[in-house]
Amino acid sequence: MILLSAIITIGAFVYWVSLVQSDKEVTGLAEFVPLILLAPFVLAVLIRFNYWQVIGDAVEVTENQFGDLYAQYSDIAAEMGLDKLPRLYMGNGNGVLNAFAAKCTVRRSFVVIYSDLLDLMYEHGDVNGVRFILAHELGHVKLKHVAIWRFVVNVIPEYLWIGRSVTRAQEYSADRCAMHYAPEGASSMMALYAGKRLYRRVDPIAYFASFDDHKIGFWARASNLVSTHPQGHRRMRALWAMQSEGLDHHGRML
């Protein structure tokens, strides 16, 4: 990515200089060449700024800080064959159950898991559930969902109103990755929809049946279409199906 940025920057600079030195009026797309020159630098600055905005209020997980969690995390990353272990941070969820992967530099990634999700492991003894979450986020890294080139390419789907379909597909892919490396924790994803205290009390058969009673029509599809993640019942149904049908099962997009 750095090499590509350098090539684009140098090419744009040479083109801009040739236009300026000529007597031709600079119009059209040529007017945006200075912005193209600045784009790689601006992107690098934004990545670092966002990284410090996040980790400034977080706790880094290391061998000496939540060592048992770090061991689970590093083991999964090693199984995935990741060349570099992304830094892991615990953020205060303030009641929100979430985790995400992002860039900390142009070439390196990091993962954040909220403290409320870690309650599954530390308060309820659900180590497998947390392993699944960690595998899901590392799956995003392994599948290069946080790569810079994807960020650039995803601009096009956004303009075509299909950007969120791309992110939903990525969530399904990361779930399949997690199913491969930590399948025992798949059912714990119900915590995202029933909460960290009651998720184990949810009967999956009754849960799916309650949605089967509804006709999946226009409004259900429209709601799913504008979501960055698959709706809970679709995501859980896909995970449930993968447990019996294998990783080739794909969740519904529309």
Predicted regions and their residues:
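Short pre-active-site segment immediately N-terminal to the catalytic Zn-binding motif
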Residues: D116-F132, S165-R168
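Hydrophobic or amphipathic, alpha-helical segments that drive membrane association/targeting
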Residues: M1-V96, R252-L254
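Short helix/loop segments within enzyme catalytic domains
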Residues: E63-L85, W161-H214, A241-L247, G251-L254
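Catalytic zinc-binding patch centered on the HExxH motif and its immediate surroundings
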Residues: G91-F110
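Alpha-helical membrane-targeting segments
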Residues: T105, K144-S165, I205-H233
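Active-site recognition of the HExxH zinc-binding catalytic motif
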Residues: Y73, I113, N128-H145, A174-D175
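Amphipathic alpha-helical oligomerization/assembly segments
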Residues: G232-W240
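Catalytic Zn2+-binding segment of zinc metalloproteases
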Residues: A135-V153, P183-A186
